[in-house]
Swiss-Prot record:
Gene3D superfamilies: Ribosomal RNA adenine dimethylase-like, domain 2, Vaccinia Virus protein VP39. The gene is rsmA. The keyword Cell inner membrane does not apply. Specifically dimethylates two adjacent adenosines (A1518 and A1519) in the loop of a conserved hairpin near the 3'-end of 16S rRNA in the 30S particle. May play a critical role in biogenesis of 30S subunits. It is found in: Cytoplasm. Its EC number is 2.1.1.182. This is Ribosomal RNA small subunit methyltransferase A. It catalyses: adenosine(1518)/adenosine(1519) in 16S rRNA + 4 S-adenosyl-L-methionine = N(6)-dimethyladenosine(1518)/N(6)-dimethyladenosine(1519) in 16S rRNA + 4 S-adenosyl-L-homocysteine + 4 H(+). It comes from Bordetella avium (strain 197N). S-adenosyl-L-methionine binds at residues 13, 15, 40, 61, 85, 103. Its main location: cytoplasm. NCBIfam families: ksgA. GO terms for cellular component: cytosol. It comes from the Bacteria.
Length: 262
C-alpha cells in the first residue's frame, strides 16, 4: 500500500513508538471476549495488537482512505469499521460493557469526551491518549490552576487516572505538545447525581465563564436564590474552589427554587 499522508484537518499524528504502543496495550489489558471500540485507528498502531488479543474489534474512522485500508487488511469477522466522524456516532449502539480506547484527535478531544458521556452507563472503561494539558485539566483538583469546567463535568461521571506521558517523537508527524494516557472508569449509579444533568451543565458553564470572580457574582441573578449555608459553599467562593459535590448541591438548590429548569 502507498504511504498515507497525515491530514491536518483530521488532527492526524500517527503513533509509531513500539514501547509506547506496548505500554498502552498493557494498560488496557484486553481479554479475548472484550467488546472494545477504538476511535481513530489510523495506521493500526493499536489496532494490530488489539486484534491479536481479541475475537473481534470495532473501530470508528473518519478518513475514508484509512477506513478502506483497514477493510482491506482485516476480514470483517475480525474488524468492524464504522466510517464516520466520532462526534456523530451513537456509541450506545455498541452495547453494554464496551471498552473504548484510542489516540484521540487533539482538535476535537474535549467535545468528544463530552459526547462520550452520553454512553457512560454502558461503558466499562476508557483509555485515551490526549494532550497532556487536557488530561491535567481532567484530573485537576479544586483550587488548582488546571481545575475548570472540564474537570467538574468529567469527575462527576468518571474516576480518572493519568497513567504516563508520551513525548512528541513517539508520533509521525510529531505534535507540538507532550501527550499522555488516561484511564477513565465510569462511576456507578450510587454516585452523587444532580436532579438534572442539563441544569448541572448549565450551572457549571455559567460559574466558570468568570472563574476568577466570586461565585455569587459569576452566577448573576441566580445568586440571590442560593441558600449558601445549606449547600456548604461560602458566598465568597470562586468557581475554581468549588468541588463536584458542591456544584451538584448548587444545581439542585437552583432547580428547587425554580430559577432554572430541568
Amino acid at each position: 500500500m502507498s504511504q498515507h499522508q497525515a491530514r491536518k484537518r483530521f488532527g492526524q499524528h500517527f503513533l509509531t513508538d513500539e514501547s509506547v504502543i506496548d505500554a498502552i496495550v498493557r494498560a488496557i489489558a484486553p481479554a479475548r471476549d472484550d467488546a472494545i471500540v477504538e476511535i481513530g485507528p489510523g495506521l493500526s498502531a493499536l489496532t494490530a495488537p488489539l486484534i491479536a488479543r481479541l475475537n473481534r474489534l470495532s473501530v470508528v474512522e473518519i478518513d475514508r482512505d484509512l477506513a478502506a485500508r483497514l477493510r482491506k487488511k482485516y476480514p470483517p469477522e475480525q474488524l468492524s469499521v464504522v466510517e464516520a466522524d466520532a462526534l456523530t456516532v451513537d456509541f450506545r449502539q455498541f452495547g453494554a460493557g464496551m471498552r473504548v480506547v484510542g489516540n484521540l484527535p487533539y482538535n476535537i478531544s474535549s467535545p468528544l469526551l463530552f459526547h462520550l458521556m452520553g454512553a457512560a452507563d454502558l461503558v466499562r472503561d476508557q483509555h485515551f491518549m490526549l494532550q497532556r494539558e487536557v488530561i491535567d485539566r481532567m484530573v485537576a483538583e479544586p483550587r488548582s490552576a488546571d481545575y475548570g469546567r472540564l474537570s467538574v463535568m468529567l469527575q462527576s461521571r468518571y474516576r480518572m487516572e493519568k497513567l504516563f506521558d508520551v513525548p512528541p517523537e513517539a508520533f509521525d508527524p510529531p505534535p507540538r505538545v507532550v501527550s499522555a494516557v488516561v484511564r477513565m472508569v465510569p462511576l456507578g449509579p450510587d454516585r452523587p447525581q444532580p436532579a438534572s444533568e442539563a441544569a448541572f451543565e448549565a450551572v457549571v458553564a455559567r460559574a466558570f465563564s468568570q472563574r476568577r470572580k466570586m461565585l455569587r457574582r459569576g452566577l448573576g441573578d441566580w445568586a440571590a436564590h442560593v441558600p449558601w449555608d445549606d449547600i456548604g459553599v461560602p458566598p465568597t467562593a470562586r468557581a475554581e474552589e468549588v468541588g463536584v459535590a458542591q456544584f451538584i448541591r448548587l444545581t439542585d438548590a437552583l432547580l428547587a427554587a425554580g430559577v432554572i429548569k430541568a
